Amino acid sequence: MQERHTEQDYRALLIADTPIIDVRAPIEFEQGAMPAAINLPLMNNDERAAVGTCYKQQGSDAALALGHKLVAGEIRQQRMDAWRAACLQNPQGILCCARGGQRSHIVQSWLHAAGIDYPLVEGGYKALRQTAIQATIELAQKPIVLIGGCTGSGKTLLVQQQPNGVDLEGLARHRGSAFGRTLQPQLSQASFENLLAAEMLKTDARQNLRLWVLEDESRMIGSNHLPECLRERMTQAAIAVVEDPFEIRLERLNEEYFLRMHHDFTHAYGDEQGWQEYCEYLHHGLSAIKRRLGLQRYNELAARLDAALTTQLTTGSTDGHLAWLVPLLEEYYDPMYRYQLEKKAEKVVFRGEWAEVAEWVKAQ
């Protein structure tokens, strides 16, 4: 039975999106997991806690005996069936536990007895996690070009279209603003960092990468924060600023935040609940910046939002949203971004409309 235990092995697993059957307890998996991992635990949270308590009080032999007692009979058979199905569905996969210790070896031995030889990660999740951290530190040393611009400038799309681009907001499942949440919940911080490392490794492996193209992000993207090694390099990076006409930005924002989000919510929840979720999403975004807008201005814009939603519901038109979106951009988002950009004006190396910036980036 094979084991994978060198750093190059670990990196290869991440680059190949190798399916990982992670046998840690759900609570461990939720705290941090690799991108291609599926959680099929040897022990559930309660069983793991009981074995851990037994280990502290009575030692390893007693804990092991308790584990075998808890995972026996029908419970063991159900989990064996799940592992067997996962192995057959992912013949190129690999087993993983916390440190490559007893849990993955036990599952591996049970599978072997059932006629399935399946490799494991020697060093477990901890080794993969350290590999991800180290890879990010190393890859972040390459030069970086940041794509800047006011809200609605199409920065994310521009990054996505570059072979050396990494969509930080896509990985974080958040668009970085008060209205930035998506229908997918954000990952834990460790899982986000692991996903970022895997994406950087894959992007680097596909080409002779000379520089990264990233969006000009703040430290936080929703509830996730950028790894310090990458954030530090981004503060030193050159910036190309997209300066598109205001009307084009409004068209993008209408498509992204009104048409697409309404579609996504109704697709996920159905027409009635989807509409309620969509309304709540927009109100929550506006409410998040209430203090910065001031109560009077917030109330005015919230009333315009309500009117726009009524119009959208009755006619299907999203034009009414301009009544609150335009002042929100002119009075809040645009001044805020320009202030932030002024503080790093010496880093700006190019300005132009979207297509001009895209052409400039390709030439770098």
UniProtKB/Swiss-Prot annotation:
Q: For this protein, what is the EC number?
A: 2.9.1.3
Cystine pairs annotated here are none
Q: Which GO terms describe its molecular function?
A: transferase activity, transferring alkyl or aryl (other than methyl) groups; tRNA 2-selenouridine synthase activity
Q: Does the keyword Transferase apply?
A: yes
Keyword field contains Magnesium: no
Keywords attached to this entry: Selenium, Transferase
Q: Which SUPFAM superfamilies match?
A: Rhodanese/Cell cycle control phosphatase
Name the InterPro entries on file.
Rhodanese-like_dom (IPR001763), Rhodanese-like_dom_sf (IPR036873), SelU (IPR017582)
The UniProt entry, under Gene3D superfamilies, shows: Rhodanese-like domain
Catalytic center residues: C97 (s-selanylcysteine intermediate)
- Domain Rhodanese as annotated: residue spans: 14-137
Catalyzed reactions: 5-methylaminomethyl-2-thiouridine(34) in tRNA + selenophosphate + (2E)-geranyl diphosphate + H2O + H(+) = 5-methylaminomethyl-2-selenouridine(34) in tRNA + (2E)-thiogeraniol + phosphate + diphosphate; 5-methylaminomethyl-2-thiouridine(34) in tRNA + (2E)-geranyl diphosphate = 5-methylaminomethyl-S-(2E)-geranyl-thiouridine(34) in tRNA + diphosphate; 5-methylaminomethyl-S-(2E)-geranyl-thiouridine(34) in tRNA + selenophosphate + H(+) = 5-methylaminomethyl-2-(Se-phospho)selenouridine(34) in tRNA + (2E)-thiogeraniol; 5-methylaminomethyl-2-(Se-phospho)selenouridine(34) in tRNA + H2O = 5-methylaminomethyl-2-selenouridine(34) in tRNA + phosphate
UniProt-listed GO biological process terms? tRNA wobble uridine modification
User: Subunit structure, briefly?
Assistant: Monomer.
What HAMAP family does the record tag this protein with?
A: tRNA_sel_U_synth
* Family (UniProt): Belongs to the SelU family.
The UniProt function text for this chain reads: Involved in the post-transcriptional modification of the uridine at the wobble position (U34) of tRNA(Lys), tRNA(Glu) and tRNA(Gln). Catalyzes the conversion of 2-thiouridine (S2U-RNA) to 2-selenouridine (Se2U-RNA). Acts in a two-step process involving geranylation of 2-thiouridine (S2U) to S-geranyl-2-thiouridine (geS2U) and subsequent selenation of the latter derivative to 2-selenouridine (Se2U) in the tRNA chain.
Q: What is this protein called?
A: tRNA 2-selenouridine synthase
**Gene that encodes it:** selU
